[in-house]
């Protein structure tokens, strides 16, 4: 994609015999790009285009899955949050599926764990929870990843999935002007990278070390 001209007052650049203006899209192969002089290379910036897939039916709302992947219990459908909007969303979604959102224990950062249950006690009712059954269906119990049905789905579905991941496990880095998601599960990190790039966004992965202070000790 063309950026501002190198020479002051220039309104266009000629590339491979064609005239281009600022913000024009230049469709050029790598071989031809490498033959360009440096000043023309400096005028061109990478332009990413998202992938389009047909919509596929899934048994768990993409946002709900994204939120669980980011901050849910890997063994069942429990989530931890203090965000009012998130609590309202899951409460509404649970009711629409004949389930209940119940409040559990409070964490060290005033975060509260919420359980999505059938509201009935007994082992036989364990398998009546459609949320939990969906996790089993997509082989997600103790195996967090983005199922193929969600990775190769409509743009709207993938955006909702990414929104859930960001709301649960992401934050805005002002210094780099980017959204960062810290994820220790490597297969899931790779899936998130694919998701971001499939939507036409720039995504990178790098290793980092996270720590916190607890009772004067670094953990």
Language-model regions: role of each:
Residues 1-214:
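Intein-associated homing endonuclease modules of the LAGLIDADG/DOD-type, together
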Residues 215-219:
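Short, intrinsically disordered, charge-balanced linker/junction segments flanking boundaries
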């Amino acid at each position: 994609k063309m950026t501002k001209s190198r020479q002051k007052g220039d309104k266009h650049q000629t590339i491979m015999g064609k005239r281009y203006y600022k913000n024009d899209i230049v469709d050029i192969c790598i071989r031809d790009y490498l033959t360009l002089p440096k000043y023309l290379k400096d005028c061109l910036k990478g332009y990413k285009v998202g992938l389009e897939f047909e919509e596929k039916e899934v048994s768990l709302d993409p946002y709900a899955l994204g939120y669980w992947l980011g901050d849910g219990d890997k063994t069942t459908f429990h989530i931890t949050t203090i965000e009012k909007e998130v609590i309202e969303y899951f409460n509404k979604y649970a009711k629409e599926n004949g389930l209940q959102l119940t409040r559990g224990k409070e964490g060290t950062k005033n975060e509260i764990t919420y359980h999505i249950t059938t509201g009935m006690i007994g082992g036989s009712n364990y398998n009546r929870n459609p949320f939990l059954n969906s996790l089993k269906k997509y082989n997600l119990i103790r195996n967090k990843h983005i199922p193929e049905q969600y990775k190769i789905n409509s743009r709207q579905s993938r955006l909702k999935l990414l929104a859930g991941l960001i709301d649960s496990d992401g934050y805005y880095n002002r210094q780099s002007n980017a959204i960062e998601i810290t994820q220790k599960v490597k297969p899931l990190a790779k899936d998130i990278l694919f998701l971001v790039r499939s939507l036409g966004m720039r995504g990178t992965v790098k290793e980092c070390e996270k720590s916190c202070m607890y009772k004067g000790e670094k953990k």
